[in-house]
């Protein structure tokens, strides 16, 4: 029996579809780490351990990011009010999370600056600034205050950006310029809007999209790794890309990994355009504090007592009144009569000399650095005051800090 070439081709195509049923759209695109370099940063050997690997803890911290070995590139979709170009998820930042998903913040006051824009101007980075003003835009406040917040909160926790990692004749704040270039370069490798558009997912005020389709479109352009998406009231709000890193933040290789968080998006996602046709803004999330601040007590779950005004746990007196405020760039602040609250030397503290720490909420629980659990060495008795710490570092007594509104 003989078959025509056309018949053979048809059969071959059918067999191919059975063996490999994925369409071209479903094919996984290899992620290419951006070419990064810094003339002033310490050179790193080729066998530098990958962050969060078994050898990372004992490696040269100028060449292996630790403990913040998970780098997270984050993007906004701000549609009401519209922020940035209509066809761009704008840049939020690049964050060093710990390998367990927790994170540090505002780690090194000696690295903090008053103005990222002024530093970049001083270093002659006008072209970089022009680009940042188009793609790295906050939904409130000035661009410079936003960039400065990102540097002071996140970049000061990056071990590979310390002064000791740079040559002695490097210009002052060269690490900041290298960091800004890196954040922009990594951002440009993950164009969320184009990834979605190629899969037929575009902003539409009358449609919803399946969460699985959203994720497939993003994952297939990220080495098949799971991308993180966040929603507010069913509307897409942020997209996060997770990496491990081989080498320094400013000259290393970014290696995609799976999302280590959990998505807040429903099965059907709204993706409104930035032209104002997307309807009314979503209602405030239950976890968002009132703009004017909310007053209440901070109780200890499963235990007697509460926090007093200096931030210590006390069981024999009156609970302090805390004000829960809205932090300018996400999260919440806490203030008592003693002053702003923060985690200082590993313990929750409220004092007039403190910076206003950035906390978040999980329901009524107070979260710091991604950790909703807190700890102390013992339960206080009598007139004793006991300090509390985020995570398990404070001791064997574990609990949540619960904000109870008055």
Curated annotation (Swiss-Prot):
Domain of life: Eukaryota
Main location: other
Cellular localization per UniProt: Vacuole lumen; Cytoplasm
Entry-linked Gene3D superfamilies: Ribonuclease T2-like
Disulfide partners: 44-63, 52-99, 62-165, 107-157, 231-265
GO molecular function: ribonuclease T2 activity; RNA binding; RNA endonuclease activity
Keyword Metal-binding: no
Catalytic residues as annotated in Swiss-Prot or TrEMBL: 92, 150, 154
Gene Ontology CC annotations of this record: extracellular region; vacuolar lumen
Family: Belongs to the RNase T2 family.
Summary of the function given for this chain in its UniProt record: Rnase which modulates cell survival under stress conditions. Released from the vacuole to the cytoplasm during stress to promote tRNA and rRNA cleavage and to activate separately a downstream pathway that promotes cell death. Involved in cell size, vacuolar morphology and growth at high temperatures and high salt concentration.
Name of this chain's protein: Ribonuclease T2-like
Organism, scientific name: Yarrowia lipolytica (strain CLIB 122 / E 150)
């Amino acid at each position: 029996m003989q078959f025509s070439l056309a018949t053979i081709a048809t059969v071959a195509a059918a067999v191919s579809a059975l063996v490999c049923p994925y369409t071209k759209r479903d094919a996984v695109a290899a992620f290419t780490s951006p070419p990064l370099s810094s003339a002033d940063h310490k050179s790193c050997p080729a066998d530098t351990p990958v962050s969060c690997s078994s050898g990372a803890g004992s490696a040269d911290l100028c060449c292996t990011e630790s403990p913040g070995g998970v780098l997270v590139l984050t993007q906004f979709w701000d549609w009401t009010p519209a922020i940035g170009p209509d066809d761009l998820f704008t840049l939020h930042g690049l964050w060093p999370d710990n390998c367990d998903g927790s994170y540090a913040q505002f780690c090194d006051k000696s690295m903090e600056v008053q103005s990222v824009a002024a530093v970049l101007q001083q270093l002659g980075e006008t072209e970089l600034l022009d680009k940042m003003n188009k793609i790295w835009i906050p939904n409130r406040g000035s661009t410079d205050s936003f960039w400065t917040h990102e540097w002071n909160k996140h970049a000061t926790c990056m071990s590979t950006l310390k002064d000791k990692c740079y040559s002695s004749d490097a210009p002052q704040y060269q690490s900041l310029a290298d960091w800004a270039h890196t954040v922009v370069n990594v951002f440009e490798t993950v164009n969320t809007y184009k990834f979605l558009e190629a899969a037929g997912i575009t902003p539409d005020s009358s449609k919803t999209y399946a969460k699985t389709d959203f994720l497939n479109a993003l994952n297939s352009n990220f080495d098949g790794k799971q991308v993180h998406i966040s929603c507010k009231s069913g509307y897409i709000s942020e997209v996060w890309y997770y990496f491990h890193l081989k080498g320094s933040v400013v000259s290393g290789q970014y290696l995609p990994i799976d999302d280590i968080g959990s998505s807040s998006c429903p099965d059907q996602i709204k993706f409104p355009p930035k032209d104002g046709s997307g309807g009314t803004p979503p209602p405030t999330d239950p976890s968002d504090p009132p703009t004017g601040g909310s007053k209440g007590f901070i109780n200890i779950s499963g235990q007697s007592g509460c926090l007093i005004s200096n931030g210590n746990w006390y069981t024999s007196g009156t609970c302090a009144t805390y004000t829960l405020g809205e932090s300018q760039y996400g999260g919440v602040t806490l203030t008592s009569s003693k002053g702003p609250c923060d985690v200082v030397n590993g313990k929750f503290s409220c004092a007039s000399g403190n910076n206003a720490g950035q906390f978040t909420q999980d329901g009524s629980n107070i979260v710091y650095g991604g950790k909703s659990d807190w700890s102390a060495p013992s339960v206080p008795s009598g007139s004793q005051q006991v300090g509390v710490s985020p995570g398990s570092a404070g001791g064997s007594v574990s609990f949540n800090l619960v904000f109870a509104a008055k």
